[in-house]
Amino acid sequence: MRKEKDNIGTLNLPDTVVYGIHSLRAVNNFPVSGERINPNFIKAYLQVKLAAAETNFKIGLLDNKKYECIVKAIEKLILETNKAIEETDNTIFSKVIVDPYQGGAGTSLNMNINEIIANTALELSGKNFGDYDLIHPIDDVNLSQSTN
């Protein structure tokens, strides 16, 4: 188990899960429909995150190492999402765990996407999930964006 901390407190997450504390809180707080987010919507979200990373790099807010890590992670996640769209592999659904009707302005989905990008970037860099010193879901992946 790994421990992750946010402004509310600390939670334990299995070492093997790619999502983080905000996603887990959302699932516990908003267990609405049990349905999955449409993979086309996940892909669109990932494409927006890619554009944000590219922009943040171009204007000097992300250094080259963080930028490359984030881009590689997003590219990997887009490939997984494409497989879900083609209905050949559902791996992405073990990562994007929030309910489509998770209440509010999309904060839970945004944080779920931020966490899986950050943790995938960490994994590709040989780091453990949740070791956010290299890539942080809010400070790096969500840089220059609202959490909503």
What are these regions (language model features)?
Residues 1-148:
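Conserved, well-structured ligand/cofactor-binding cores
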